[in-house]
Amino acid sequence: MRVLSEYKGKAGELLREHGLSVGDRVRIVRDDGVVVEGIIMPRSELGDDEHIVVKMDNGYNVGVRVDRIEKLEAPGEGHEPSFKPMEGEIEYDPKLPNVSVMSTGGTIACRVDYETGAVKPAFTAEELVGAVPELLDVINIVDARAVLDLLSENMEPKHWMKIAEEVVDALSDPDVEGVVIGHGTDTMAFTAAALSFVIEGLNGPVVLVGAQRSSDRPSSDAASNLIAACAFAGDGEVGEVTVCMHGWTSDEVCLVHRGVRVRKMHTSRRDAFRSVESIPIAKVDVKDLRNPKIEFLRSDYRRPEDGEPEISGGFEEKVALVKFAPGMDPEVLDFYVDRGYRGIVLEGTGLGHVSEQWLESIERAVDDGIAVVMTSQCLYGRVNMNVYRTGRLLRAVGVIPGEDMLPEVAYVKLMYVLDRTDDIKEVERLMRTNIAGEIEGGRVLGGFEPADGPHHRL
């Protein structure tokens, strides 16, 4: 019998009684009649001894409480899954572009760790090719590095800076055409915005890529997303930070979004990322994974600059993002004022409004030298604080219009701007200046169609 991977206590005893181990196929009947069938997965050392984890045929993992198992049987032999990196050296192809690939801890190109039961990123060139062999026909991975190992919700400004430094280092190599960054999807848009502002003089594409479903799932989007991202990075045509993810639910096309106009708009769909009131820079046809085809959808993207990129500043962390809701106490603003915050981004309603009851707290914040920026919860459309009375009152006390910036982009930008200057007039000037394509200004039409409309099927 194979060795159990961290199954202890009740769960370990039950499996031993039935002669079962990790990798065996099992059929479990629960006390309520629910049947679970699949492969026994390892149990993490951090897990309890009350559950048995099973990977079902649909790719999902489910934990079954031991005290609810009425029947346990083995319908057939399973197998303990394994992962093998490519053996031997990867042959360099001078006809292919050179790309640096970085990992920050997302599920892109992940494999199952059968000691902990978790998914771990493949971050050496051999591991990446072992996970996605089609990469050999698309790029040369001349540099593969694990920059961070974080769930994206744990990202902080110091991590954005670490990634930025690694990007600048990679693109300082004249042989590298572009950089691909594997990143968790939940806060990918924040990181994309941060890199867009803090790196100046990009001499090649920087492409953030993720996966809504890890590569141990049959429905994983990891391979096609990674190949599309690498193809776009290797193309070397764009000098911007971008995000490359599924264009729609099938595996036909990935879209490349501008890093300051993109948002995760769905919790679980593979096409969760959308360019908001903007058109993606390009689409990548990945029906043939070994021969992805790039089609540009707009021509106003920034071209790579000559020379080497550089870090242009940092991020002031004493900045808050506050979403207004009816009945919400303005004391939330006083909290940040009392704690010495330097900036507040408001997500207001409609054209940029909050309750008039908030005016006193907002005026107090402005009088204390705090930059207060207004964005809209609507996401689509532009803040206009000159139309209605509330907007004019807010403008009169010193609230800065956030134009048509997405709230999270305005949040990151304000952190960046406040790191550069304390002068509130200069803060307003910079916040209303288009630095990295974050302010479209209504110049792009066709960004408001429903998901199944013509924009979505670009």
From Swiss-Prot:
PROSITE patterns: ASN_GLN_ASE_1 (PS00144), ASN_GLN_ASE_2 (PS00917), ASN_GLN_ASE_3 (PS51732). InterPro entries: AsnA_fam, Asp/glu_Ase-like_sf, Asparaginase/glutaminase-like, Asparaginase/glutaminase_AS1, Asparaginase/glutaminase_AS2, Asparaginase_C, GatD, GatD_N. GO terms for biological process: amino acid metabolic process; regulation of translational fidelity; translation. Its EC number is 6.3.5.-. Residues 97-434 form the Asparaginase/glutaminase domain. GO terms for molecular function: asparaginase activity; ATP binding; glutaminyl-tRNA synthase (glutamine-hydrolyzing) activity. SUPFAM superfamilies: GatD N-terminal domain-like, Glutaminase/Asparaginase. It catalyses: L-glutamyl-tRNA(Gln) + L-glutamine + ATP + H2O = L-glutaminyl-tRNA(Gln) + L-glutamate + ADP + phosphate + H(+). The active site is at T107, T185, D186, K264. Keywords: ATP-binding, Ligase, Nucleotide-binding, Protein biosynthesis. Disulfide bonds: none annotated. It is an enzyme of class 6 (ligase). Gene3D superfamilies: 2.30.30.520, 3.40.50.40, L-asparaginase, N-terminal domain (3.40.50.1170). Allows the formation of correctly charged Gln-tRNA(Gln) through the transamidation of misacylated Glu-tRNA(Gln) in organisms which lack glutaminyl-tRNA synthetase. The reaction takes place in the presence of glutamine and ATP through an activated gamma-phospho-Glu-tRNA(Gln). The GatDE system is specific for glutamate and does not act on aspartate. Belongs to the asparaginase 1 family. GatD subfamily. Heterodimer of GatD and GatE. This is Glutamyl-tRNA(Gln) amidotransferase subunit D. It comes from Methanopyrus kandleri (strain AV19 / DSM 6324 / JCM 9639 / NBRC 100938).
